[in-house]
Amino acid sequence: MPNKVYDVTIIGGGPIGLFSAFYSGLRSMKTKIIDAEPAVGGKVRYFFPEKIIRDIGGIPAITGENLVANLKQQAETFHPTIVCSERVVDVTKLSDGTFQLTSHNGSIHFSKTIVIATGSGTFEVNKLEALHAEDFPFAIHYDVKNIEQFRDKVVVVSGGGNSAIDWAQTLEPIAKQVHLIYRGEDFKAHEESVRELQNSRVEIHIHHEINELIGTNNQLTKINVCCNKTQATKTIQTDALFINHGVKVDLGTMAEWGFEQADFGIVVDDEMKTTVPGIFACGDSATYPRKIRIIAAGLHEGPIAINSAKKYLEPTAADEAMISTHHESFIG
C-alpha cells in the first residue's frame, strides 16, 4: 500500500480543486484529484464555458472555458494524478491514520489527508419537464458549448438568478433579440449585474411565467407567457429557450463522513479544518462566518487548506509555501 498513498487527495476538480493541486505541488506534496464528472472544471466547465467571468482579481474578463483550461494547465505543473468519473462514496480512517476513499465503482484510494473541494456537491440541472418540453429537444437549452449558434436569433431566457442574467447579457450582443422571463420581481443576482441588465437591450418580463410552448417538427417558434399578477397573457416569437431554474444538489454520503455540516456547507475554522482531523474543506464546500462565495475567495481558501494539510503531516513544516517566483521549479 505505501506506494499508493498520497499526501493529499483533493475531492473535486473544479477551479478551487485545480488551484489547490497547483499549490500542493509548491508544497512538494504527492497529490491526487478525484472528480465525479468526466472532465475537470466543475460547474464552470458545465454551465459557464462561454460566459464571461469577472470576479477574479487581475483578470478583467475571461470565459469559463478558458479559465478552466488555464487552471488545468497550472494544476498539471507538478504532475498530480487526476481521476475522473469517480464519485467518492465512503471515507474511512484506518488504524495507521491513513484515509481509505472508496468510489462508487469500487475503486479504492489511500491518502494521508483529504481536501474537499466539491462545491455544493454533484449537480443536475432542473429541467423543464412540463408543457411538452420533450417535443423541442434541440430548441431548449440548459448549457451552451457554442454561443455562435445563436447569432441573429431571437432567444428567451427563463430565470432570475445570476446564471440567467449572465446568459441574457452574454447573448445580448450576439442575438437579434433577447427576452428574460422571471416569475418574481427582485432578481437574485449581483447588484451590478442587475443594473447592467436593466441598461441593456434585453427585454425584461417580470412577474411572468411560461405557460405554453408552440412549434412544429421539433422546432420551437413561440412561447406564451402569463403574468402571475394580472393573469394577462402574451406571445413571444423565439428560436431558442434557455432554462436557468437552478440545480439539484446531491451531497451524496458526505453527511456520513463524521464532520459537522451547516445549511451552506461543511463547517470549517479559519485554517479550513473540519471537525475530523486530517480532512479539510474549501470553496463552496466550506462554510464559516462572513463567507464570500465567489471564485476569487475560493482560490484563497484552497492554499489555506493545503497549508493546513501540510502542517498536519509535518508539524515543523513552514506555515506556507515560498512564493512561486522564488520556487526552484520556475527558476532557470
Curated annotation (Swiss-Prot):
Its EC number is 1.18.1.2. It is an enzyme of class 1 (oxidoreductase). Its cofactor is FAD. Binds 1 FAD per subunit. Gene3D superfamilies: FAD/NAD(P)-binding domain. Pfam families: Pyr_redox_2. GO terms for molecular function: ferredoxin-NADP+ reductase activity; flavin adenine dinucleotide binding; NADP binding. It comes from the Bacteria. Keywords: FAD, Flavoprotein, NADP, Oxidoreductase. InterPro entries: FAD/NAD-bd_sf, FAD/NAD-binding_dom, Fd--NADP_Rdtase_type_2, Ferredoxin-NADP_redctase_2. The keyword Oxidoreductase applies. FAD binds at D35, K43, F48, V88, F123, D284, T325. It catalyses: 2 reduced [2Fe-2S]-[ferredoxin] + NADP(+) + H(+) = 2 oxidized [2Fe-2S]-[ferredoxin] + NADPH. The keyword Iron does not apply. Belongs to the ferredoxin--NADP reductase type 2 family. PANTHER family: THIOREDOXIN REDUCTASE 1-RELATED-RELATED (PTHR48105). Homodimer. This is Ferredoxin--NADP reductase 1.
